[in-house]
Amino acid sequence: MYSYFLGLRTLTVTRDAKELIEKNYDIEIDFDNMSFDDPEVYEMFAEGNTLGIFQFESTGMRAILKEMKPDNFENIVAANALYRPGPMSQIPTYIQNKSNPNNIAYLHPKLEKILNVTYGCMVYQEQVMQIVRDIGGFSMGRSDLVRRAMSKKKMKVMEEERRYFIHGKKDKSGNLEIRGAVRNGVDEKTANQIYDLMIDFAKYAFNKSHSAAYAALAYRSAWLKKYYPVEFMAAQISSMMGSSDSVSKYIRECRRLNIEVLPPDINYSEGKFIVKEGKIRYGMAAVKNVGSAAIEEIVKIRKEKGKFESFIDFCEKVPTTVLNKRQIESLIKAGAFDSTGAKRAQLMAIYEKTIDGISKQRKNNVDGQVSLFDSNSISEKFIPRDNLPKLKEFNEKVKLNLEKEMLGIYLSGHPLSEFEEVIEEMSNTNSSELMELSHEHSVEMDRRLYDGAKINLGGIIIKKQNKVTRNNNLMAFATLEDLYGSVELIIFPNTLDKYGEIIQEDSIV
């Protein structure tokens, strides 16, 4: 079910990216007639440049792709099928055989035409069906029975079929129903070995048609990322607006690709992330507490009445029925009013008074159309038009913390930016990779992060809570944030006693 959900999200991403591309470049993309033979797309796979690519973006998978160096569609179909618990054990053989096809040894020559596409490795259920047909003489229907037995792990049924596979079967009238491997020129010992391989394969049997469908989605995504990276990444981030860790990960990928991500802006942003002049504009619907419905109304009003010239102009044009104080505060903290020329510190000082004044004025006007700042308006008692208080802007740390509060990420900078090189040099992993280890396959494949391995991770302590143990010792729970996301830490008494002075909130460790 998880893969199907991911597949649906990927379809949304490709659809949204396609719409952005067609709008920005006035071209039409025809996925239905797309060929799967672009060497530059496969070069992306071979380089492990697949962050954001369906089924191919985990750390472990990207490491495998760099070793496998896929150069055709069959390779990525196989990679998708092999990268899961069970068949992973065949990945080294697949990679070695792909590099040295002359060294592939088949148990019997009849297997070559069936397994050559996967370099001698048994990868798909369909290959098993073909083996029992070509070597055992099974019918199409009976080979499907074997496939179903495998997919449901019915080992008893599979063992019953073994003797038919080797020696064949006669019907009640004595007519030969299944020829069997021996009659087809395969000796009994070899036939048993082949069947043993199929039994072992049953532990992780995967349907090639499923893997091919996933690979096709992945290829489309990779094609978009290769030729239209800005639109692809904008659509990708929009699809993950509910996950700050994912948004942070993809924005970091944008920086790696030299794609500039601009902050949310009341005059330029829409609900989703959009592309303008080769840059991504942050979606206002991703600002906490605001909501998509309110953003839709803001965009609608902006189209009808023009750009918002100032904070006051915004408050006059957008009714409080659309946006309340909390929502406006969130937009201020996120920097969405920066383009009006007002400082965030100034707006934080006046926004409540401004909204109260406008609300009172609207109540005093029957039709609600008289401007708050008409010459006879009583609202001048509340705040003069655009006369902002003389306040210094928040310092960089405060601004970044406000961004983090409202966006879930640091956008215009990061408290760790000046330490990035040192952290990268001294760390052997990051929070994003550690989060992926919650999946079994990542644990198996990442050779650096095996169970019990020593982890070096740099970041900033953003939260710490002390706790007294049953033995009256002090331990702590903490949250460490790095440039990729955050992880939860447990600090046991001995460690806390030794390093307690530096394990404090806001400490860089």
Role assignments for model-derived ranges:
Residues 1-509:
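Noncatalytic, beta-rich nucleic-acid-contacting surfaces in large DNA/RNA-processing enzymes
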